[in-house]
Protein backbone atom coordinates (compact mmCIF):
# COMPACT_ATOMS: atom_id res chain seq x y z
CA UNK A 1 0.00 0.00 0.00
CA UNK A 2 1.25 3.47 -0.88
CA UNK A 3 1.69 5.84 2.09
CA UNK A 4 -0.88 8.60 2.33
CA UNK A 5 1.69 11.36 1.93
CA UNK A 6 3.12 9.92 -1.30
CA UNK A 7 -0.29 9.60 -2.90
CA UNK A 8 -1.36 13.09 -1.88
CA UNK A 9 1.94 14.58 -3.06
CA UNK A 10 1.47 12.90 -6.44
CA UNK A 11 -2.10 14.24 -6.62
CA UNK A 12 -0.87 17.73 -5.71
CA UNK A 13 1.85 17.61 -8.37
CA UNK A 14 -0.68 16.55 -11.00
CA UNK A 15 -3.07 19.27 -9.89
CA UNK A 16 -0.37 21.95 -10.10
CA UNK A 17 0.67 20.71 -13.55
CA UNK A 18 -2.94 20.93 -14.72
CA UNK A 19 -3.38 24.38 -13.19
CA UNK A 20 -0.17 25.58 -14.82
CA UNK A 21 -1.33 24.31 -18.19
CA UNK A 22 -4.70 25.95 -17.70
CA UNK A 23 -3.16 29.32 -16.89
CA UNK A 24 -0.30 29.33 -19.42
CA UNK A 25 -1.81 27.76 -22.54
CA UNK A 26 -3.86 29.91 -24.90
CA UNK A 27 -5.27 27.02 -26.95
CA UNK A 28 -8.68 25.93 -25.70
CA UNK A 29 -8.05 22.26 -26.47
CA UNK A 30 -4.95 22.24 -24.26
CA UNK A 31 -6.88 24.12 -21.59
CA UNK A 32 -9.55 21.41 -21.68
CA UNK A 33 -6.88 18.71 -21.34
CA UNK A 34 -5.35 20.58 -18.39
CA UNK A 35 -8.77 20.73 -16.73
CA UNK A 36 -9.10 16.96 -17.17
CA UNK A 37 -5.71 16.49 -15.49
CA UNK A 38 -6.90 18.60 -12.55
CA UNK A 39 -10.10 16.56 -12.19
CA UNK A 40 -8.11 13.31 -12.26
CA UNK A 41 -5.71 14.67 -9.63
CA UNK A 42 -8.61 15.43 -7.30
CA UNK A 43 -10.05 11.97 -7.96
CA UNK A 44 -6.67 10.41 -7.15
CA UNK A 45 -6.63 12.25 -3.83
CA UNK A 46 -10.07 10.81 -3.01
CA UNK A 47 -8.94 7.26 -3.83
CA UNK A 48 -5.73 7.58 -1.81
CA UNK A 49 -7.58 8.98 1.21
CA UNK A 50 -10.26 6.30 0.98
CA UNK A 51 -7.61 3.60 0.74
CA UNK A 52 -5.75 4.98 3.74
CA UNK A 53 -8.84 4.91 5.95
CA UNK A 54 -10.09 1.68 4.34
CA UNK A 55 -13.38 3.22 3.27
CA UNK A 56 -15.05 2.74 -0.12
CA UNK A 57 -16.10 6.40 -0.20
CA UNK A 58 -12.98 7.39 -2.13
CA UNK A 59 -13.79 4.96 -4.92
CA UNK A 60 -17.37 6.20 -5.07
CA UNK A 61 -16.13 9.77 -5.38
CA UNK A 62 -13.71 8.63 -8.09
CA UNK A 63 -16.58 7.20 -10.12
CA UNK A 64 -18.46 10.47 -9.67
CA UNK A 65 -15.39 12.47 -10.76
CA UNK A 66 -14.88 10.30 -13.85
CA UNK A 67 -18.55 10.72 -14.77
CA UNK A 68 -18.24 14.48 -14.34
CA UNK A 69 -15.04 14.51 -16.42
CA UNK A 70 -16.68 12.53 -19.22
CA UNK A 71 -19.65 14.89 -19.35
CA UNK A 72 -17.37 17.93 -19.24
CA UNK A 73 -15.16 16.52 -22.00
CA UNK A 74 -18.05 15.70 -24.32
CA UNK A 75 -19.69 19.10 -23.93
CA UNK A 76 -16.34 20.89 -24.12
CA UNK A 77 -15.26 19.08 -27.27
CA UNK A 78 -18.61 19.76 -28.94
CA UNK A 79 -18.27 23.46 -28.16
CA UNK A 80 -14.66 23.47 -29.37
CA UNK A 81 -15.67 21.84 -32.64
CA UNK A 82 -18.37 24.44 -33.27
CA UNK A 83 -16.03 27.27 -32.37
CA UNK A 84 -13.34 25.96 -34.71
CA UNK A 85 -15.84 25.71 -37.55
CA UNK A 86 -16.90 29.33 -37.07
CA UNK A 87 -13.56 31.02 -36.25
CA UNK A 88 -10.97 28.61 -37.75
CA UNK A 89 -8.89 28.91 -34.57
CA UNK A 90 -8.88 27.71 -30.98
CA UNK A 91 -6.73 30.55 -29.66
CA UNK A 92 -8.56 32.12 -26.74
CA UNK A 93 -7.15 35.60 -27.43
CA UNK A 94 -8.67 35.81 -30.92
CA UNK A 95 -11.94 34.23 -29.85
CA UNK A 96 -12.47 36.65 -26.96
CA UNK A 97 -12.22 39.76 -29.17
CA UNK A 98 -15.51 41.58 -29.56
CA UNK A 99 -16.95 42.25 -32.97
CA UNK A 100 -18.54 45.53 -33.81
Curated annotation (Swiss-Prot):
Transmembrane region(s): 4-24, 28-48, 60-80
GO molecular function: NADH:ubiquinone reductase (non-electrogenic) activity; quinone binding
InterPro entries with a match to the protein in the record: NADH_UbQ_OxRdtase_chain4L/K, NUOK/Mnh_C1-like
UniProt topology in membrane: Multi-pass membrane protein
Principal location: membrane
EC number annotated for this UniProt entry: 7.1.1.-
Sorted UniProt keywords: Cell inner membrane, Cell membrane, Membrane, NAD, Quinone, Translocase, Transmembrane, Transmembrane helix, Transport, Ubiquinone
Top-level taxon of the source organism: Bacteria
Subcellular localization: Cell inner membrane
GO cellular component labels: NADH dehydrogenase complex; plasma membrane
Disulfide bonds: none
Biological process terms in GO annotation: ATP synthesis coupled electron transport
Catalysed reaction equations from the record: a quinone + NADH + 5 H(+)(in) = a quinol + NAD(+) + 4 H(+)(out)
Purpose of the protein: NDH-1 shuttles electrons from NADH, via FMN and iron-sulfur (Fe-S) centers, to quinones in the respiratory chain. The immediate electron acceptor for the enzyme in this species is believed to be ubiquinone. Couples the redox reaction to proton translocation (for every two electrons transferred, four hydrogen ions are translocated across the cytoplasmic membrane), and thus conserves the redox energy in a proton gradient.
UniProt record similarity statement: Belongs to the complex I subunit 4L family.
Subunit and interaction comment: NDH-1 is composed of 13 different subunits. Subunits NuoA, H, J, K, L, M, N constitute the membrane sector of the complex.
Annotated NCBIfam families: PRK05715.1-1, PRK05715.1-2
Name this polypeptide is given: NADH-quinone oxidoreductase subunit K
Native organism: Pectobacterium atrosepticum (strain SCRI 1043 / ATCC BAA-672) (Erwinia carotovora subsp. atroseptica)
